[in-house]
Curated annotation (Swiss-Prot):
The keyword Signal does not apply. InterPro entries: Ribosomal_uL14, Ribosomal_uL14_bac-type, Ribosomal_uL14_CS, Ribosomal_uL14_sf. This is Large ribosomal subunit protein uL14. GO terms for biological process: translation. HAMAP family: Ribosomal_uL14 (MF_01367). The lineage of its organism: Bacteria, Bacillati, Bacillota, Bacilli, Bacillales.
Amino acid sequence: MIQQESRLKVADNSGARELLTIKVLGGSGRKTANIGDIIVATVKQATPGGVVKKGDVVRAVVVRTKRGARRKDGSYIRFDENAAVIIKDDKSPRGTRIFGPVARELREKEFMKIVSLAPEVL
């Protein structure tokens, strides 16, 4: 469960290392985001020579949460960290690689490029 001021790791090679959530998109007054939701965030840490710089305001999709998500069959998927992938306006990732596993819920929310780049889909 990601809310305003939440910090997330970045799971791609766009150059950002850590994000701070500014806003959760999708509805008036929406407070929290879960796996597959889009957020607006600012870059808090970045690597030198990356595509994005510290202080940039970006859009990102949440790919892993500590709280996890309940599936239709009754099972839960839960991760050790909160992580996101920085995306462009057309929902394609800014980076060319994805690090770590991503949840299957991204496939249902039509982030197919992220799913295809990920090393493992749980």
